[in-house]
Amino acid sequence: MTRPVSRATFLSGLIGLGAFAVAPNAHAARNSDAESYVQSNATAALAALADNNATQRRQQFQRLMTQFADMDRIATYMVGRYSPALRADADLRRDWRVAFQDFAIATYESQFQNLSGGIVRVTGSEERVAGRDVIVTSEVRPPRGSTMQVRWRVLRSGEGWKVMDIAVGRDAVWLGQIQQRQFLAQLDENNGNVRALINDLRGRTTAMRNTPARS
């Protein structure tokens, strides 16, 4: 039986990741282009969440997130060793990407609402691979509450910079690997049935979308 992914489980996985943390390197070069990319896009995303019109807020936030993050690449990464099933079935691959993207964006919109209208300040960056793989560090100061430290792993491809992972908090714990492990645990339990995982995420996304939101 597939173990459902709750919103709390999703976010606890995001905040709980530590295995992929990248140790700071005081001698690593900075990348001003990647820093500017994060500054402008993170600022725009938080500004979108401040829109009082729920429909416009959701549409604008989704548009920005799909531009900001490499959702297709992240979606494939999330199923790990089960990704050959996606390569073999175009319909399954499309449905999985859509379901994962909708679930992830709905979760971020809900949980990051308290940061809406916050001020983003990029504080530095560290090149892991020169010109291609960069960790950008930032602080987010919400209208209410404490400043939050956020790190962004961005990769440069033919389409420019794209976010691949985010780390939240002073411990610089990353978001991607534990969520992948949770998905893989579900797939292991249901004999690799990606379609069952898709249906689970669709149900969870619908529940989040139907939850009354600020308007």
Locate the predicted segments by residue.
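N-terminal secretory signal peptides that target proteins for export/translocation
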Residues: M1-R3
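N-terminal export leaders
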Residues: V5-L11
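Boundary at the C-terminal end of the N-terminal hydrophobic targeting segment
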Residues: A26-R30
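Early exported N-terminus immediately downstream of N-terminal targeting peptides
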Residues: N31-F112
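Surface-exposed, charged secondary-structure patches
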Residues: W96-V98, I105-M148, D200-S215
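Short beta-strand edge/turn micro-motifs at domain boundaries
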Residues: T147-I178
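Low-complexity, intrinsically disordered terminal/linker segments enriched in charged
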Residues: I166-S215
